[in-house]
Amino acid sequence: MRLYDVHTHRPPADLTTPAVVSIDASEPFEPRPGGCYAVGIHPWHAAADRLPLLRLRAAHPQVVMIGEAGLDRLAEAPMSLQIELFEAQVRLADELRKPLIIHCVRAWGELLDVRKRLRPDSPWIVHGFRGKSPLATQLLDAGLSLSFGLLHRPDALRTTWDRRRLFVETDDSPTPIVEVYECIAGELHVSVESLAHDVEKRFTALFH
C-alpha cells in the first residue's frame, strides 16, 4: 500500500514515500535523487520577473507538476498581476503537459473565469480545500479535482469522494501522511487501503 501525498512543503524522510514537494520559484531548488517536485509562483510571492526562472526549472525531469499557482484575495499583490501570473502558469502546464496544483483563497469566481477562458488541457488540483459542499460541486462540475488535509469540511470531503476526484496531502503540516489518510478514511467510513488505492489510481492517471 502506497500513501500518495499530492502536495507537501516537507520532503519525506523516506524517499519510498510518494510525495510531490512544492517549491516556489523564488526558493532554491536542489532536487534530491528520486524526489518529485512541483514548481510555481505562489500568489503571495507574485512577481513577473520570476517567470523565466520558473520556465527553466519547470522543464527539469523531476518537476512533475506546476504550482502551487493561483489567486488569493489576502495576498498583497494586485489581483490583476495574480491573474496574469496564474494564466502564464496555466499555459506553461499545458505546454509541458504537467498537472497544475492550485492555491485559491476567496477568488473562486476569478479562478473559474480563467479556466473557462483558457480551456486548459492539463489537470487542475485545488490543494488544501476547506470550502463547503456546494463550492466543491461547482469546482468538480468544472472539471477540477480537490486535495484534502486534516482541516476540511466533511460534507465537501464526501462530495469529492463520491465523484472520485479526491487527493490527500500534508501541505506544511508535520503530521505524517498515514495519519491524514486514517483521518479521512475514518470520516468516509472506508478502509485506509481503499482510500489509498483510489488516490494512487487517480494520481497515476494524471500522467497518462
Each language-model region and where it sits:
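Mid-domain alpha/beta scaffold segments of enzyme catalytic cores
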Residues: 1-208
